[in-house]
Amino acid sequence: RQQYHKKQSWRAAAPTPERQKEVNWRLDQAISPGLVGEIGIHQIDLVNWFFMLRPTAVTGFGSLRQWRDGRTVPDNVVAIFEYPGGLFLTYEATLGSSFDGELNLFFGSDCAVMLRDRRAWMFQEIDAPQLGWEINAIKEQFYKSTGIVLAAGYSKAMPNQTAKPAEVPQDPKSPLQYALEAFVINSYNHQAAIRDFTSAYDPSDTNALKQYLDEIAKMRVPAPGWAEGYEATVAALKANQAVAGNQRITIEPAVFELG
C-alpha cells in the first residue's frame, strides 16, 4: 500500500490568464498525467522493483473534492494495480489532507515493512520465526505496534533500547548522490569489462560478448535504467487513464516493450 497526502492546491500564480494556463498544465486533464502520474510514478517504480514484476491491470477512481477552481484533474485518486501471482498494490493520493504524509507499506505473512522519509521499519507477526539480529535491534513504537528499525549497523549499536526518532542519524547522502555514484561505478565496470574481453577474446564474437556482459550486469550496483523508467511511466499513465474513466484497464505485456 502506498500513499501521498499533502494539502496543497498545485496551482501556481501567473500575471495573465494565458500564462496561468501554461504554468498550471498539471491541472488540465487533457495533458496532465494527474496525481498518479506526477507523484505516484516514483512509488509505483519502487513496487515494480520490489516485486520484480509488471502490473497486468489497474482500476482507478478519482474525484474533485477540495480544489473546485476550474481544474479538471482530480485532487483525490485511488488506483489498485494487479500483479501476477495474486499480488496487489493500492495507491492513494490526495491534495486535500496532509495527515500521515507519504509512505510505502509491504505486507507479508511474517512481517510488514514500512518505508517513509528515507527510513524503514519491520513489524513482525507474533508467530513469525526469529531471525536473531532483531533481538538487539533499535525499536520504535507506532501506536500499538513496535517497529524494528531497518538500518545498516544499528542491530547492535544500542542493545535492547528504544530510540527516539531524533537520535537515529539521517543518511547524509541525497537520492541524487546515490544515483550518480551508481551510474559512475556501473559505467566504469561496464567499460572495464569490454576492455578485458577484447584483450582476451575475439572482439567480433558478439554473442560471447553479450553473454559476458550479461554476467557482469548481475554485479551492478542497484540503479534504475531507461527500461525501469519506461515501465513505471507506462504503469502510471495507464493508472491515470483508469482514474479519469473510473474504470479497470488491462495492461497488455506488449505495451512495456519498445521496438
Please give the residue ranges for each predicted region.
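C-terminal helix-rich "cap/oligomerization" subdomain common to oxidoreductases
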Residues: 182-259
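A structural signal for well-ordered alpha-helical segments within the folded catalytic domains
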Residues: 34-37, 41-48, 74, 174-181, ...
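NAD(P)-dinucleotide binding in Rossmann-like oxidoreductases
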Residues: 69, 82-179
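Acidic/polar loop patches that form or flank catalytic/metal-binding clefts of enzymes
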Residues: 53-61, 88-92, 113-116, 193-196, ...
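Active-site rim elements
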Residues: 30-37, 63-68, 92-94, 163-174, ...
